[in-house]
Amino acid sequence: MCMKALTKYAWNGVLLHFKQEMTVTNEPGIYLEGKFGVRIENTLLIVPAESTAFGDFLKFETLTLAPIDTAPIVLEMLSTEEREWLNNYHCRVYESLFPYLEGNDKEWLRKATLPI
C-alpha cells in the first residue's frame, strides 16, 4: 500500500492542519462543461496510524459505507492498487451492511459489491 504524507490542506485560502478525530470528505469527480458532473463522496475520519522516530502519523478511515457503482469504470485505467482498494472497500461495505438487510436488498448488495 502506498503511504503518502498529507499534513495540511487549504480551504478558501486558509491553511488547515489535519488533526486526530477530524472528519473530512474525499470528493473525486468529473465535470463536463455544459453537460453534467459526477462525484463520488466519502466521509473520512482521521485516526492514529503509527509512531516512529520521525513522529506520530495519522491516516484516513473511511466512514461512508455505500457501494460505488462500477459500471462507468474503465477497468484498464485502474492500477492494481486502485482495484485492490475498491475491492477491499466493497468487501467492508458488504460485511458491514449485509446482516441488516433482508430478501432482495441482500441480493442487490451482493451484486453491487462484487470484486472487479
Cite the ranges covered by each PLM segment.
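Charged, cofactor-coupling segments
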Residues: 1-116
